[in-house]
């Protein structure tokens, strides 16, 4: 892989994005499992049907949940209250650990995964297609449902300084 020169690295790092927690669930009963990750590479990709893209690193556990036909939820974090969720879902979890322990979720409103009570909004999506890049999958999802909890709040924004890490 070609290394980035300093100016290019800094220029790419200036691409900003919102802060999100992507969640997904699979299975039922004894096979039920859930996963989550912090994301900032999320973008609206189509109007009709409404669709979004999410970049997911190939090494993320949640990537295996996000296959064509499967559901996921994008929880949009609030500018005034994102730190707790951001820190919680950035930490490493032991295999099999409950990523949602000590996190308030709203049950039975999204098919794709948990909706975080503290999120500004959520988008319930179904994977329509996937595009492979060298180190990420670009997941295109059709938005099937969504809601905003507080119209007066703004989305938390992530500003990077360089492009070689999140």
Predicted region positions:
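Basic, polyanion-binding surface patches
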Residues: 1-166
